[in-house]
């Protein structure tokens, strides 16, 4: 019996574990990003694994402003909101955890937007 393995998922999981292990060993506050085909999620998580700030395209404020929530425009807005919420809590330096996704497209747009609004990573 042959088992099907999706190479994309295996590669993403490998990248995820490798990067997360390095970030956790530093004990830094991290900006964790996750994407699906329809939504973007961003969380700021402390070294004790507590969520300090959260933003996603599921929020009614963001959802009402956008026609579609799974594109670069939505990622840019989520990046802006997560940066503002982090700065309100006094967080300016974070480690960027892209959850194994390639630094391209929506992930890059979210990171650039968060940097432009004051987060440093």
Swiss-Prot record:
Pfam families in alphabetical order: Ribosomal_L18p
Domain of life: Bacteria
GO BP terms: translation
CDD domains reported for this sequence: Ribosomal_L18_L5e
Keywords: Ribonucleoprotein, Ribosomal protein, RNA-binding, rRNA-binding
GO CC, any one term: cytosolic large ribosomal subunit
Gene Ontology molecular function: 5S rRNA binding; structural constituent of ribosome
Family in the record: Belongs to the universal ribosomal protein uL18 family.
Subunit record text: Part of the 50S ribosomal subunit; part of the 5S rRNA/L5/L18/L25 subcomplex. Contacts the 5S and 23S rRNAs.
Function summary: This is one of the proteins that bind and probably mediate the attachment of the 5S RNA into the large ribosomal subunit, where it forms part of the central protuberance.
Record-given protein name: Large ribosomal subunit protein uL18
Gene: rplR
């Amino acid at each position: 019996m042959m088992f099907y393995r999706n190479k994309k998922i295996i590669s993403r999981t490998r990248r995820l574990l490798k990067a997360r292990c390095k970030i956790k060993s530093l004990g830094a506050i991290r900006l964790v990003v996750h994407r699906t085909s329809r939504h973007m999620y961003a969380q700021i998580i402390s070294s004790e694994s507590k969520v300090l700030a959260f933003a996603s395209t599921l929020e009614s404020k963001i959802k009402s402003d956008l026609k579609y929530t799974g594109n670069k425009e939505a990622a840019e807005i989520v990046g802006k909101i997560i940066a503002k919420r982090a700065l309100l809590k006094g967080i300016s330096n974070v480690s960027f955890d892209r959850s194994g996704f390639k630094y391209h497209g929506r992930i890059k747009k979210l990171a650039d937007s968060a940097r432009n609004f004051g987060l440093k990573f």
